Amino acid sequence: MTTQPMQFVPGSEFKRRAAEVVANPFLRKSFRGAMDFLIAKRAAQFPDPELLERQRTLAEEIRRYSLSRLPALLEQLEANLVKNGVKVHWAENPDEANAIILGICRQHDARLMVKGKSMVSEEVELNHAMDAAGIEALESDMGEYIVQLAGEKPSHIIMPAIHKTKQDIAKLFAEKVPGVSYTEDVDALIQVGRDVLRKKFMDADIGLSGVNFAVAETGSLCLVENEGNGRMCTTVPNVHIAITGIEKVVEKLEHVVPLYGLLTRSATGQAITTYFNVITGPRREGEKDGPREMHLVLVDNGRTQAYADEQLRQTLQCIRCGACMNHCPVYTRIGGHAYGTTYPGPIGEIISPHMMGLAATHVLPGASTLCGACGEVCPVKIPIPDLLIRLREEATHEAKPGHAPLVGQGAGKTTFASLAFKGFAFLYSRPALYRLFAWGATRFRFLTPSNQAGWTATRTPLKPAAKSLRDLLAERRIDERKSC
Amino acid sequence: MQRNLPAGPRPKDVYFFATCLVDLFCPEAGMDAIQLLEREGITVHFPENQTCCGQPAYTSGYADEARAVAKAQLDLFPENWPVVVPSGSCAGMMRHHYPKLFAEDPMLKAKAENLAERVFELSEFLLKVLNVKWKDSGKPTKVTLHTSCSARREMGTHLHARELLAQLDGVEVLQQSHESECCGFGGTFSVRQPAISGAMASDKADALKETGADAFLSADGGCLMNINGTLEKRRDSFRGQHLASFLWERTGGSGGKNGKGEKA
Ligand code: SF4
């Protein structure tokens, strides 16, 4: 079973895909309904805005503190993991991550890997690499399983199959799972998935999982999940490989508690998830279960680029709750696939440029009205709109003197836009010239073009008023003098 | 977001920063805002050299260009008077982004910070500084309110319009669905991503119209142009009006020469 490799996403592609979804009333309605549901679930968990504010401030502090000590914490994490019997690997990019995991699989002659939900494994295209090496990598999270069966990519970081309706899934299972007939009964559908997966857990050579929080002080990996498949993946097969980004580390176990509480409430509106796994090493002597061997792969993939800049570093505070997507009016209109990145929505717009470079992603920071809904709900207070503006600047300009260029720096620069904004600055920083312009624009308003690029696709043309406010005020002054 | 308001007596003088949109595209709203202030006994000063807050360049990532335009506004408000802005997003630009824009120039930063402190969105100023108390003089009507994202999330003024309208006995304010959602304008976003922007504007127009209100109100010129332009293209007669104009009309104008009532 394969998923398609990540699609390259040049600006025109994004625009085209977005326009396609927007023109589909069925999809529009379905996304809107799903997002409304998630928004309401989250809101119900936060009845007291002041308390929420205090919690967000604390969570932000913890994430900032952790990042401020990142190199030291990573060293401490590694030392403690090794002490606990976990092998630690460092991967600078997706190829390295895949090679490491493939190497471990080969050591064990592995044929089958069962996977818990891991966005970093999506980010490095692990399934694709495993498939190319002839190893079956099977998703065991229900949403991921559905997406994999369909040969697609997740469209949401928490709910990978949110773009699929019950009917889509019924059809998919009937087509792809041997011996299953069409049913729209959700419980029956879930049971189909369970039956398939249950057996695979027993047969798998390798269990792969993500990590929500890595605790430096104890060398523990925390895994948040609802289906129990994460626990199966990390305990049943003989080898457990965890994969995560280098930013996920916190110093102490107690730092996990406030983050966990906000993560589940922000993501699915749950006060707590059904499962919370704290994994501190492989099976020990005398223990009856657990993997005999355990690995952690720590992936950089552009994170150090974000880390190097004080402002952009805030991107790494993210705990991947998905609330920014759920509340994003753009994501709600176009869904996750239009972005063409592993992480869609607002978080995707600010993190993908570091992972894929600005040449492939420069359009994404611009795919926002800067309405601020994302920053308002982000549990770790990432100022997403400010970061979008910053990336818009980096995408259209050379690096500032003394600053290292980002990968793909300036790739979105166009002569048209540069000239337009130069013209804007020229006109609006010269009051006398602007007054002349305003005078002309109002007098010659009949010359206003009726086709105004994107604006008039769905709106009537913009036309200056017959008299500007300045004109009206000047007239009033004359009137006043006359009436004296 | 909620600010500390200046203590002390009611100001006698204010500056009015019209914004480029109001100056050229909805000057009537600017006039009505000025008259609302004047009726409270305030002298309104309109610096002739004002142009634009620089926001279009700033949000598009052209910080140098935004700085050039913003710099041209910094010296226009020398007296220590409040600066009233009839648009949430431009007020937000001056109040929150000017100090950041000049972060690396201590002299200009000090100026920008001083200005930022004095910037008020119109409804905020009317309600919180002037404590206006109005009597409604219009026929019963139903309206719905679109609060801009900047008013809501940058200025924290989204409830002020509601409170002002609550003073008007004949005005019923109807609740739209997805009230806090953006109308899809987003400055240059509306031309860079026309399909998404158009879909958002269209959904917003639907939500406002579905309330059954006679009209919708907004304190932001950009949102008004976006939603009204969408409705007009659909040949729908439902329209939005700037909050300032509505307030001026409902409260009877001043009876003076330039009152809306007289012009009509
Ligand atoms: S950016 Fe904030 S809201 Fe978005 S996924 Fe990350 S933590 Fe959640």
Segments the model singles out, each with a brief description of its role:
Chain B
Residues 1-264:
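Iron-sulfur cluster-binding electron-transfer modules in prokaryotic oxidoreductases
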